[in-house]
């Protein structure tokens, strides 16, 4: 049953794969592998609660630890467990590939940002390379606001100026903090 599930998984037929993986989750031979793949499929469909439950069941096994570190940091971030996301992200960072390091930097930086630890957020926000090499307005805003909170108004102004042409809440907040930053530099 595991092999059938894996065949469906590699063919990207997750519904059938899940059916077969669920048949072997309690197996001594294939249970942990089935749980890992069920967790991965849940993660890919943004069902982070289920993914986390599956991953927690196999997190003590070395062959999955390295693969799951990034997923668990990301899931905890998306579930609002920011301190846990930071802890997992920091643990995973030295073992990660270059492309994962950028995403982990974003997870750690945004988690610190949400925890209002702006001084700790700054280096990680700066290390983030952006999606396909590009930052979005929220990325610039968070970096600008972290600078603003550190009373580094010159750098805050630089970041806020990158996004004030938008018509959304992020741009409105940027305008407000940009004005505040200019007032505090005079």
Model-found features: residue ranges?
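Acidic, polar-rich low-complexity tracts and alpha-helical solenoid repeat scaffolds
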Residues: 1-186
């Amino acid at each position: 049953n595991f092999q059938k599930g894996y065949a469906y998984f590699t063919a990207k037929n997750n519904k059938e794969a899940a059916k077969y993986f669920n048949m072997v989750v309690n197996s001594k031979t294939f249970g942990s592998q089935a749980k890992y793949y069920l967790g991965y499929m849940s993660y890919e469909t943004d069902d982070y609660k289920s993914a986390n439950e599956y991953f927690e069941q196999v997190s003590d096994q070395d062959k999955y630890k390295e693969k799951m570190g990034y997923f668990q940091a990301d899931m905890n971030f998306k579930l609002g467990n920011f301190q846990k996301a930071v802890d997992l992200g920091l643990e995973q960072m030295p073992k990660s590939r270059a492309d994962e390091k950028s995403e982990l930097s974003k997870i750690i930086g945004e988690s610190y940002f949400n925890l209002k630890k702006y001084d700790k957020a700054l280096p990680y926000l700066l290390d983030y390379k952006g999606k396909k090499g590009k930052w979005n307005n929220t990325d610039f805003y968070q970096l600008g606001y972290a600078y603003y909170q550190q009373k580094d108004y010159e750098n805050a102004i630089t970041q806020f100026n990158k996004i004030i042409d938008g018509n959304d809440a992020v741009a409105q907040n940027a305008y407000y903090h940009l004005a505040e930053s200019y007032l505090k530099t005079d």
